[in-house]
Amino acid sequence: FILLPLSDAGLPKDVEEKKQIINTIYDKALSLGMAHEDIVVDGLVATIGANPKAAIECYETIAYCKDEKKLPTICGLSNISFGLPERMYVNTAFLTMAICKGLTMAIANPSQELLMNAAFASDMLLDRPDSDIAYIERMSRLAEEKAQYETVVVKKSDNDASASNGTC
């Protein structure tokens, strides 16, 4: 299950309170029969526009879960950039830094090429198993797709030019 570090009082005020909430909910989950392996902690990232320390607090939470609790983590990437222009750059930078801190999963748009490429590159730079091959395969596939697209566009342009000259 996804452990959301929230209490009846609402959002935690700081990282220490967030850790206390994580511990309380974690202990309760175990007492109810949940297995450690079934628990994933949400980093609970806020928008940087409302809280300038939002990213840092999320990184600290992720590191705590990884290093102290040995728990996987997840977070919604786009929360960090809410209300900002050119959000994909903020989201991508946030993702790469969160991966470095131990982020296991992200709620993200997989069609955002920059974001996905950064995730593959981050895994490779952290020497995660088989990440080098995964990165190379991804880049090769993207290069092939780009070449196919460019071929289709060129052929379409050639056909359009001959049609406008009155030839078939």
Residue ranges and their predicted role:
Residues 1-38, 46-74, 78-168:
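ATP-dependent carboxylate/acyl-activation modules
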